Each structure stands twice: as C-alpha cells, then as structure tokens.
Amino acid sequence: MPGFQNANISDLAPPAREKTFDDTIAVKIPEDEKNTWFSWRKLWAFTGPGFLMSIAYLDPGNIESDLQAGAQAEYKLLWVLLVSHIVGMLLQRMSARLGVVSGKHMAEIAYDYYPLVPRIILWLMIEIAIVCSDMQEVIGTAIAIYLLSSGKIPLLVGVLITILDTFTFLFIDRYGIRKLEFIFVALISTMAISFGYEFVVMKPVLTKVLTGTVVPWCSGCGKEEIITAISIFGAVIMPHNFYLHSALVKSRKVDRSSKTRIAEANKYFSIESAFALSVSFFINLFVLSVFARGLYQKTNGDVNSMCLSHNDIPDSNVFPNNTSSVTVDLFQGGIYLGCQFGLFAMIIWAIGIFAAGQSSTMTGTYTGQFVMEGFVRISWPKWKRVLITRAVAITPTLILCIKAHGIKNLTGMNDFLNCVQMVQLPFALIPMITFTSSKRIMHNFRTSKPLQYFSIICGIITIGINVYFIFQYVTENFGTGWLIFVIIGPFTLLYIAFILYLAIYCLVACELMNDTVNLPGFDFHRTLELDAPWITETFVVNDVYF
C-alpha cells in the first residue's frame, strides 16, 4: 500500500517553515549559584505553558457541562470533575515531557513517525477537533457579548465581532511569549474572580461540596446522570490540547545536551501544570456548585416565576412556565443568575464567559499553527494562518446562527460539538502514548512500564466512555432505526479500523508487539531524525543507555 509506507508529503509542500518558537524568543532559564532541588526563580521561568494548556479545561464547553451537571445531579458529580482533572494532569505531563525530551512537538513527530496517508488522516481529524472547539468558543463569546449588551447586540453580530480576536492575538503575540502568557493568566484570574463571586453569593452547602468531591459515588443517579458524568469527562480531556502542550514547552530554552537540565525542566513543568490545573479545577467547581445550589430539583416554572419581576434582564421569559425539570445552558445560566441576584450577577457571569471564550480562541489559534507547522509544513506568514483558522471556525458558526433562529436554539449545540471532539480523542491520545513509550524518540526518558500500562488503561477507558456517549447521543437524537445504522455503519467501521491501526503502532512502541512483524500498510522502521544529545555513549545493555 504505497500511501501507507514510504511516500513523503514534503514532495507536496516545501519543508522550510516559520518556526513559532526559536532560540531568539525562547525564555532563558536562570542558573542558580546553589545546587538546590527547588528554586522559585526557576519555577517562575518555567511558569506559563501550563496556564495556556489549562485554558482547554475552562472553555465555554466545559463551563456548560459543569452547570448542567450541577442542575441535574447537585454536588454528586464533583468527584468526576476531580478524577478527570487528575487523569488530565497525568496525560498532560506526558505531553510536556515529549516536547522537552525530543525537542519537537507531537505534530512534528507524527510527520516523521507515520506514513503519508495515516498522518494526513490524523491531521484532518485534529483540524476538525480544533474547529469544533473554536466554534464552542465563538458561540460562548457571542453569548457573553449578547448578555453584556442586554440583548442589544444579536448573536450573529457577536460572532462577527469575534473576528477581532484574530487581530488581538496577532497584536499581543508581537510582544513575545511572556506577555502573551501574562494575558492568559489575567483572563484566568478574571474567570476565577467572576465565578468565585457567584460561588460566594450563592452560598453552596460546603459540607455537600466536600462530600461530592471526595466520595466517588452518585446515590440515586440514573442514566441521565451517568451521561452527564461522561460529558464532564469528555469535555475536560481535549484531543488538541496534547498537541498544544507539547509545543508550548518549547518556548523555554532547555539545554538538551544535559540530562540534568532535561530532568529539571520535566520537574518544573509538572509542578506548574499541577498548579494550573488545580486552579482550573476550583473554577469548574465554583460553576458546578453555583447551579447545584440554585437549580437542583427546580422546575422551569420555578425559575419563570422568579424572572417575572425582572424587566431589566434580557429574555427573562426564556424559561417556559411548566413543571418540567429545568434545563440550562450558558445563556440560560446567565439569565437565571440575573433573575436570582440582579443584573450585576448576570454581567459578572457574562464577563467570566467572555474571558473563557477569549482565552480559548487564542489557544485554539496557537494549536492550529502548531498542527499546520508539524503535519503540513507549509511556510505561511503567521497572520495568514491565524485568519484562515478563524475563518474556518466562523463560517459554520454563522450558518448555524442563521438556521438556529435565535440564541435560545443555538446554545444546545454544545453537546454535538463535544460529541465530535470525543470522536477525535483517540487520534491524539494513542499517538501521545506511542511517542512517549518509544525508545527511538524518548530514549532513556521513555515512560516506565507501569506508566505505559496505566496510560493504556486510561486510554481504553476514556475511549470507551466517549464511544458510549457518542452512541447515546446518536440514538437519542436520530433514533435506533435500521437506516441510521446503515448510514453510520461504514463510517464506524473505518473509524474503528484506523484506531486499531494506530493501536498497533502503540503496541510496538510499548514492546507489547514485535516490530519485525510484516504487516501490509505498516512501516515500523521509518527513519526518525530525533537525536539524544544528552547521551555521550551510544551502547545499550538491557535497554539501559550508558
């Protein structure tokens, strides 16, 4: 199969390309006079990539999953939020180590590791994930603008306004990576203050918050709560975020000729990522707890009667006057807070959503750059890449805005977009496990056998959870008729076949399958230009480098 073996995409595009990070802009790491295990100065120098990475855990899609979980299951799913952040931290640590040790990010390694056709498929899948994520962020920002303007700026205009994000990103990026990281920290702080304010005002029951966080159980939960728990997990583990994090760590100038310096970088990046994701967890906890306290076991009629006296709140009649359990999304969540605590609470909520959308769109743009640089290797000016990335995301969003006939019908797109991103997850998770387990890439920094097995198990569970969620979404929205399965059947088989294709490469990298097996369409011995400058001698005894 020629397309699956030795074809080279460099025949189609020039290999030379503009590097996002190089030695002239990479942050230098200070040298301490004293050889101490920990240095605050060094931690500060390494601080930044983890916060940019953590934005994916705070995007509008995650916020909406949080508020729906709170309204539906009260505090009972907080432990799912905690577990998903812990698993995410372990996976992000692997992604960061890959970038530090190899000196390349995931897309660049995939270009060298896989044959032509598989890597083109990988590239397209990740681009789809980026576009879907960007659509969520565009919609979230447009909703925030709608609420901040008290409904005077319609959703369609709000979507068009988000084009300015591109120019904002280009303007900030000109001043260097540290300035950009500061902006992201400011946006995360804005979210923490906004959602923290709502948490304080709502006064959740702290004992229930603590119990829901540490007790891994959901008493009295049924099918709907299980699906909600799955959506929380799926919304947190974002496929394109692994590609992003492995590239962001390259913004630090790490001496790869020194094993000590590489280990040091891995340590500080792990500490920074753990802190950033801890902040992310508490922000998500704030949102879930607010709506657990305010909307659990409430009906649409309850909220409708609350909103009758608030003429200053736009669309205060969004909740129908019936006895059905209340359903809520980003837009309705803001309206509810306005009806409960006044216009100021709605504005604070909108500011938090705006910050989430702004930060997520900029990281999505960055990810699009890295993916294009690695997979396609097209030498484009940065402004052109940014504009095209945003145009691809805005075009389908505009179409949805026109067809949705109003903001009330559009915000429910979150479940569909989360579903599409879940479909893409194996195409980031499996390659990452493969690369970090490979001796040819990581050498003596490859993940240990226990961690390999743990990550494989996590991967299988995560993919299984996502497949279950996708099945539920399809059957609930399109039914279970034979025609549906006839239509999606061929695509499902191709999807599973490609996952198995990637899984075989992963098993070979983990040495669970012999690379001497001659399988059609596989090339286990592609030449990789990954050096190991920290290794002074190149002989190996029992897989240990000396």
Swiss-Prot record:
Location(s), subcellular: Apical cell membrane; Cytoplasmic vesicle membrane
Extracellular topology ranges: 64-70, 141-152, 203-228, 292-334, 408-415, 475-483
Transmembrane segments: 43-63, 71-91, 120-140, 153-173, 182-202, 229-249, 271-291, 335-355, 387-407, 416-436, 454-474, 484-504
Stretches assigned to the Cytoplasmic side: 1-42, 92-119, 174-181, 250-270, 356-386, 437-453, 505-546
Disulfide bonds: none
Membrane topology term: Multi-pass membrane protein
GO biological process, one term: response to metal ion
Null mutant phenotype: Increased mortality rate and increased body levels of Mn(2+) when Mn(2+) levels are high in the environment. Reduced survival rate in response to infection mediated by pathogenic bacterium S.aureus. Iron levels are low, independently of Mn(2+) levels. RNAi-mediated knockdown partially prevents CEP neuron death mediated by the neurotoxin 6-hydroxy dopamine (6-OHDA) but not when mediated by high levels of Mn(2+).
Glycosylation sites: 321, 409
Chief place of localization: membrane
UniProt GO MF annotations: cadmium ion transmembrane transporter activity; iron ion transmembrane transporter activity; manganese ion transmembrane transporter activity; transition metal ion transmembrane transporter activity
Tissue specificity field: Expressed in dopaminergic neurons (at protein level). Primarily expressed in mc1, mc2 and mc3 epithelial cells of the pharynx and vpil-6 pharyngeal-intestinal valve cells displaying an anterior-posterior expression gradient. Expressed in gonad sheath cells.
InterPro entries named in the record: NRAMP_fam (IPR001046)
Induction cue: Slightly repressed by high levels of Mn(2+).
GO CC terms of this entry: apical plasma membrane; endosome membrane; intracellular organelle; plasma membrane
Keywords, in A-Z order: Cell membrane, Cytoplasmic vesicle, Glycoprotein, Ion transport, Membrane, Transmembrane, Transmembrane helix, Transport
Family to which this protein belongs: Belongs to the NRAMP family.
Function field: Probable divalent metal ion transporter which regulates Mn(2+) uptake.
Name of the protein this chain belongs to: NRAMP-like transporter smf-2
Organism: Caenorhabditis elegans
Taxonomic lineage of the native organism: Eukaryota, Metazoa, Ecdysozoa, Nematoda, Chromadorea
